Amino acid sequence: MQSFVLMIIMANVPTVAFSNGHKMPMLGLGTAKSKNKDAARAVKEAIDLGYRHIDTAFFYGNEKEIGEAIREKIEDGCVTREDLFITTKLWNNCHKEEHVVPACEKSLANLGLKYLDLYLVHWPFALKEGDNLIPQDKSGNLIESDVDYVETWRGMEECVHQGLTRSIGISNFNSEQISRLLESAKIAPVNNQIEVNINLNQEKLVDICKKRNITVTGYCPLGHPGNALGIENKLDSSVMLNIAKKHNKTPAQIALRYVFQKEVAPIPKSITKSRIKENIEIFDFTLTSDEMNAIRKLGTGERVVDFAKAKNFKYFPFNIPF
């Protein structure tokens, strides 16, 4: 069973140790859909506020801006590279083994870094190779590639061998895919990044990851407030409002604390300084077991991110419960 021995760093953000000994801050800044100057500004403000864990991906299209922000904060003496934990992800059109190292090198060049702290396989299924990140046929259907993620993983392991990244992991992998990958992996994944929030608590998958010594990072930890997906915003529920009032916190802070107390590292996305500050102020209180159970009962299992256009692909991860 994985030991979640937590150490305290700046801004009182705990860290968790990977199976390989490296450590990851248990809260980070998510940057999906944060573009250009917004992404750079958010990263700089986050670092000033005590964030040390920054999450991005090649698919987000903001690696260069994030890299510029990181360099600026290093140059002004706010942090050193060793203080930071930087994650990015391999996109689906580069799943062939021989494409993985070049893709990692491209992300490093974009970020202006010599190494990554964590490199993830963004999704278990592959898309047609080429420059188009979302390849589609004339009917608008996604074009699948038949590359097996087991092959992709060999390329990920080579990234470690070449010193391009300290750790490697997966994202959006289900329990069966994790088991199959571990059967052949020479370097085990240290992390699985999945959607985790009060609506989708992922208890069974998180438990499986823990038993396999795989840490979990939670994206969309606030669900999708104000979204157009038809998913009820549980942050406004009486349960969340009452718990927030008791702790003198916001419902969003309660939601993030809930994810954290499940031993999942939330990576909330924001480009608003006040919210970035609010999101890191979750380590000075604790939810009771009754409060955790009350929040747990709010879940319906609905996903914000379902990538439904790929639901018929061989390695689509969401066709089983977990």
Report the location of each language-model feature.
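CE4/NodB-like, metal-dependent polysaccharide N-deacetylase domain
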Residues: V100-V121, E158-Q162
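N-terminal binding-site loop/beta-alpha segment at the start of enzyme catalytic domains
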Residues: I8-L84, E98-P102, K114, P221-G226, ...
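Residues embedded in well-ordered beta-strands within globular domains across many folds
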Residues: G28, D55-F58, D117-L120, G169, ...
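N-terminal amphipathic/basic-hydrophobic helices that include classical n-h-c signal peptides
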Residues: M1-I9
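Beta/alpha (TIM)-barrel catalytic core signal, keyed to glycine-rich beta->alpha loops juxtaposed to Asp/Glu
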Residues: F125-F322
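Short, well-ordered amphipathic alpha-helices
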Residues: K64-E75, C104-L108, M156, I178, ...
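Short acidic/polar active-site loop segments enriched in Thr and Asp
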Residues: R52, K114-D117, R166, V190
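A short, structured active-site edge motif that brings together acidic residues
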Residues: T80-C94, L118-P124, Q193-V196
